[in-house]
Amino acid sequence: MTLLKNDTFLRALLKQPVEYTPIWMMRQAGRYLPEYKATRAKAGSFLDLCKNTELATEVTIQPLERFDLDAAILFSDILTVPDAMGLGLYFAEGEGPKFKRAMQHEADIAKLHVPDMEKLQYVFDAVTSIRKALDGRVPLIGFSGSPFTLACYMVEGGGSKEFRTIKTMMYSRPDLLHKILDTNAQAVTAYLNAQIDAGAQAVQIFDTWGGVLSDAAFKEFSLKYIRQIVAGLKRESEGRRVPVIVFAKGGGLWLESMAQIGADALGLDWTCNIGEARRRVGNQVALQGNFDPSALFGTPESIRAEVARILADYGHGSGHVFNLGHGINQHADPEHAKILVDTVHELSRQYHGG
């Protein structure tokens, strides 16, 4: 086991004392980096990049070479799980992800089952390879989509603006949706545990579309299944706690409920005030966020001011991991991302220690 040279991220997630607020960025390995685009071109396609251990390792490490980040996140996609279930994932140019076989008929849903984790071996190989390449520099985060977010793509057959198909199923045949969600929850639990076995030192569950649901529907069709996953995860590996982060975009309404599902931290999108969020969840969980990704289009001065505001809103003490409130925009200037990272480190020290 390689000793971690920088474990600030893990300590902050567990609300242990830190010297500064750690930062990583959702989608930190991505299209805003010219070096990522070059590696992606070499791979041929996005899926080929995910499935090539060497290149997935390369793009995971790229942002760490450029910025002083406190964590790396596995380069992969949330839709690897339904792809392994046999839904036939493909990416249409300019249209995003699509599935050849959408889950819309009772007969198909009845046949849906947890995939053999061997079909996802390329992901676990990437985790092992990235850990080796990191050599203890910073922790590695593994991740998965939430059962509901995965179901959105599986039922709609791709991305959607209004989620009419899945919401029709939810209100007219909730039994079918529950079958999909339960299968997804079992699959995600096995998938994240296999990532932890391969070397992931923290895991994040992305509930990207939970925020489109009503209050009652969120609790029944999303939160219930995230809780099921959290209860089934390995929480210790290599002699350390493996923290679990739950990020629901648009989930600010449900922070109190989310704080009670057993996760170590909650991710916040940019619409929440982090100080209010801290008061609402009390001492139950750490918080991650929540810089508006669009604020990177501002000036260096405005970026610094926004960082200062978020740090001041959170206030003194540990339990805050700085991040964006959603993935970094592909048009963001890497120089502005560097200003963000360096400013967080510089301005946060006054809120720790002493």
UniProtKB/Swiss-Prot annotation:
GO cellular component, one term: cytosol
Any one GO molecular function term: uroporphyrinogen decarboxylase activity
UniProt cross-references to SUPFAM superfamilies, sorted A to Z: UROD/MetE-like
Binding site for substrate: R27, Q28, A29, G30, R31, D77, Y153, T208, H326
Signal peptide: none
Entry-linked InterPro entries: UROD/MetE-like_sf (IPR038071), Uroporphyrinogen_deCO2ase_HemE (IPR006361), Uroporphyrinogen_deCOase (IPR000257)
EC top class, as a word: lyase
Catalytic reactions on record: uroporphyrinogen III + 4 H(+) = coproporphyrinogen III + 4 CO2
GO terms under biological process: protoporphyrinogen IX biosynthetic process from glutamate
Keyword set, alphabetical order: Cytoplasm, Decarboxylase, Lyase, Porphyrin biosynthesis
Compartments, record wording: Cytoplasm
Domain of life from the UniProt record: Bacteria
Residues marked Transition state stabilizer (site): D77
Involved pathway(s): Porphyrin-containing compound metabolism; protoporphyrin-IX biosynthesis; coproporphyrinogen-III from 5-aminolevulinate: step 4/4
EC nos: 4.1.1.37
Record flagged with keyword Ribonucleoprotein: no
Annotated family: Belongs to the uroporphyrinogen decarboxylase family.
Description of how the protein assembles with itself and partners: Homodimer.
Summary of the function given for this chain in its UniProt record: Catalyzes the decarboxylation of four acetate groups of uroporphyrinogen-III to yield coproporphyrinogen-III.
Name of this chain's protein: Uroporphyrinogen decarboxylase
Organism of provenance: Neisseria meningitidis serogroup C / serotype 2a (strain ATCC 700532 / DSM 15464 / FAM18)
